[in-house]
Design a protein with these regions (language model features):
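Catalytic core of non-heme Fe(II) oxygenases with the double-stranded beta-helix
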Residues: 1-96
Length: 96
């Protein structure tokens, strides 16, 4: 997820099964206020990105990467999703 515009209140990407980092430097990138939301919520900062893999090499989902886009309370958020389709053992087809 790439944040193209994040001039907003709210609108983060929440991973409820991740543990909050303990180092204060992370507060530039994640919501550190205790608002009752479980897990880690990445702030929608323009020019920043979050990468995660949804599946392991066997195609099983990672429970830790269950996530949700939180509501934008005010302002504008524009994000760009980039899906990676690499699978272990994949052999690309012939070049065109």
């Amino acid at each position: 997820m790439v944040y193209l515009q994040g001039d907003c209140e709210g609108g983060g990407t929440n991973f409820p099964r991740l543990s909050m980092p303990k180092e204060a430097k992370w507060c530039d990138y994640v919501e550190c206020a205790d608002d009752g939301t479980e897990g880690v919520t990445f702030k929608p900062r323009a020019g920043s990105a979050v990468f995660w893999m949804n599946f392991d090499a066997e195609g099983k989902g990672y429970r830790e990467t269950i996530h949700a886009g939180m509501p934008v309370l005010s302002g504008t958020k524009i994000g760009l999703n980039i899906w990676s389709w690499y699978q272990a053992g994949h052999k690309p087809g012939a070049s065109v």
